Amino acid sequence: MQFHGYEDLRSRLLSGELTCEQVISDYLQRIDSSRDDNIFTVVFHDEAMARARELDSKLQRGEAPGVLFGMPIAIKDNIAMKGAPLSCASKILAGYESVYDATVIKRMQAEDAIFVGRTNMDEFAMGSSNENSAIGPVPNPYDKTRVPGGSSGGSAAAVANDLAMVALGSDTGGSVRQPAGFCNIIGLKPTYGRISRYGLVAFASSFDQIGLLAANCDDAALVLGVIAGKDEHDATSSHHDVPEYDTAMDHVSVDGLRIGVPRAFFPESLNADVAGVVKAGLKKLEEAGAELVEIDLPESDYAIAAYYILVTAEASSNLARFDGARYGYRSPDSPDLSSMYVNSRTEGFGAEVKRRIMLGTYVLSAGYYDTYYKKAQQVRRVFQDKYREAFEKVDVIFGPTSPFPPFGIGDKMDNPLEMYLADVFTVPASIVGMPAISVPVGFDSLGLPVGAHLICNFFEEGKMLGIARHLQTLCQTAPSN
């Protein structure tokens, strides 16, 4: 059972050609057949089928279907859903169940979405390969010896393998966009504050955003329109109006579009295949009438350095709550309270999470706060100012999503600094809080996906999705098999 996007599925459901029960049963069978790929941490078999029957009955009663009627959706395992296990792919949250729904979950349920399961991820969203998961890595859909990217690797693989039509992810420094690039799908990080973070387990609160992974821009835009908007439970969510994203996309023309091409995004160290494929996509936009404008932006290396100081500092505070006292894993061999805290965290957290907690604690310590944390905040301000200036000259900023194609499982695990560079082109948008999207534009010489990365000004998701749709159409990348 295959569909040409959600509109195809919706029309077949509303015409009576298919039922939600048939569709969800088919998706669940495919999920079960892919169990060895470790894509899902939990599959909602009974819940999804019950929901499908409920929606079929709703349609039979003549009630109006919701905007997302019957859409099979996967949820990253760090977004709360009442009554469902929530682990963040970490041993320390073993056995924990959400006691409330995230705002995005409530809004999607209200529009008749169907959740098929939770997806694997890097532990607490810390990683770029999905290898930092307590339940093991996820293979890339195009080469099972390689990574799908991270930290939303399970969500990306679910969409690429057609196990969900859309998946929710979280993006702190590229965790939606980078795996989307590695898996040949769309990966959208909205403007900071566009989507409520209520119910998202915090990694770095001033960076975290819930994002979307989808096979095409239309499906991403549809879901974005449902989940975007102010939320009383999240003080950082924005009052900015939520437009009709499909209409905004339709008004976007490539002809006359000013595309900013930063020198910093095409360094000599960029993988030759990646550079060639991304530049070919840029050329197609130019041939369609776009104007290419070379612009100067701060070197991305500075963004990476500032980013890993700031996010680890925030993580060291946010993850202090996981101590074995109230929920999750508790070390069985602890003679006193202090030992219980130490042992539970030592045994419950993985190596990368512990590395980042220690780094964050260090940069916030009295003797180093000014040298590291304060300086990183100053660098963040410089990036914000420079990007605002850039958008006085251009409509969109263009570059590669990743400096290299999907790498082998295990290849970078012993070199965390090299792993961190996987996000070198995605981190700047997170530093400044602007919306960004990864768009599939082709394949390298080994047949591995390559993504292009677009950044737009604050709250210009509609324009960005319209440009991305043009680019994806021009490049006509093949679907995953």
From Swiss-Prot:
Gene Ontology CC entries for this record: glutamyl-tRNA(Gln) amidotransferase complex
Residues folding into a coiled coil are: none
Entry's EC annotation:
6.3.5.7
Q: Which residues form the active site?
A: 76, 151, 175
**Pfam families for the chain:** Amidase
Q: Name one GO molecular function term.
A: glutaminyl-tRNA synthase (glutamine-hydrolyzing) activity
Q: Which UniProt keywords apply?
A: ATP-binding, Ligase, Nucleotide-binding, Protein biosynthesis
User: InterPro entries from the entry?
Assistant: Amidase, Amidase_CS, Amidase_dom, AS_sf, GatA
Please cite one Gene Ontology biological process associated with this protein. Answer: translation
Q: Name the chemical reaction catalysed here.
A: L-glutamyl-tRNA(Gln) + L-glutamine + ATP + H2O = L-glutaminyl-tRNA(Gln) + L-glutamate + ADP + phosphate + H(+)
* EC category: ligase
Q: In UniProt terms, what function does this protein have?
A: Allows the formation of correctly charged Gln-tRNA(Gln) through the transamidation of misacylated Glu-tRNA(Gln) in organisms which lack glutaminyl-tRNA synthetase. The reaction takes place in the presence of glutamine and ATP through an activated gamma-phospho-Glu-tRNA(Gln).
Protein family membership: Belongs to the amidase family. GatA subfamily.
Describe the subunit structure. Heterotrimer of A, B and C subunits.
Name of the featured protein: Glutamyl-tRNA(Gln) amidotransferase subunit A
Q: Which organism is it from?
A: Chlorobaculum tepidum (strain ATCC 49652 / DSM 12025 / NBRC 103806 / TLS) (Chlorobium tepidum)
